[in-house]
Amino acid sequence: MKKNIFKNKFLIGLFLFISLLLILQFVVNSKYTFPEPHPFQGKYIYNPYRNIDNQKWERANFHAHTRKFLDPAKKVARSTFLLDSIYRSFGYDIIGISDYQSINNYEIKNNWFIPVYEHGYQYYKNHQLVLNAKKISWLDYPFRQTLNNKQFVIDQLKKDTTTLIVIVHPAYRQALSTFDFKYLGNYNCLEIANSERLFDEFYDPILSNGHPVFVMADDDSHKMTNIKDVCSSFNMINTELVKDSVLKALKTGRSIAVKFNISAYKTNEE
């Protein structure tokens, strides 16, 4: 009898909890009136590469992981050292460590260091890189997100106007659609490639609808000992090796996203 009472209380509690989450996500959440977008207009074409210094191209990756949730500190330390060593051996100038919901300060001694983390922890992979982050935002929605949900999360991350927001792996689990990119705004970059695939089909609706968004390419590496997971997608940035200069270059498009096809390679030596 007591077991049945406990079971019933648990089920009622679970039902109320899920109902609360549904209300917060779909009823209480901010509602936007998205204006109908239009293509870029004007007499001139913006050229981010105008007056660049060809001696200042730096190679960078901002999306790589050294930890999963609840990983012990010693394991994280070993993974961080290994990640740094691998990228340095391949000639990278800027090495970003974007752990989930955690800022890794391993590279803080470098003038180019930009605190970054991957935001988002729900099943549907609506994730963003937050560059120049001062703190972690735990706002997220557990169920499939509406366009309003997606915009609200971006706006909350962008409350600190010094941050740079990058939407990553939009195709994973159908997190975002080309329709979403017709209307979404207030972010800086789209990660157009990672170690697994390209996401270029999402960039056309961004530009076609007049959104000033630039591209990035990053490994999104999780298995550093797997050659196919590291050093195949990166950014060439025209910048000084100083944080503010790097951020300005990314925000103004003074960079090139690069994706190598290494599917046939089997070893690091290749």
What residue spans do the PLM features occupy?
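C-terminal functional module detector
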Residues: 1-53, 221-270
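A metal-dependent hydrolase metal-coordination microenvironment
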Residues: 25-168, 177, 183-185, 192-205, ...
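Solvent-exposed, non-transmembrane amphipathic alpha-helical segments
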Residues: 107, 133, 207-210, 266-270
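Glycine-enriched alpha-helix->loop->beta-strand junction motifs that scaffold or abut catalytic
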Residues: 111, 184-190, 210-214, 231-234
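Generic structural signal for residues positioned in beta-strands
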Residues: 112, 127-129, 189, 233-238, ...
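Residue-level recognition of short, well-ordered coil/turn positions
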Residues: 162, 211, 254-255
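An aromatic- and histidine-rich active-site surface loop
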Residues: 174
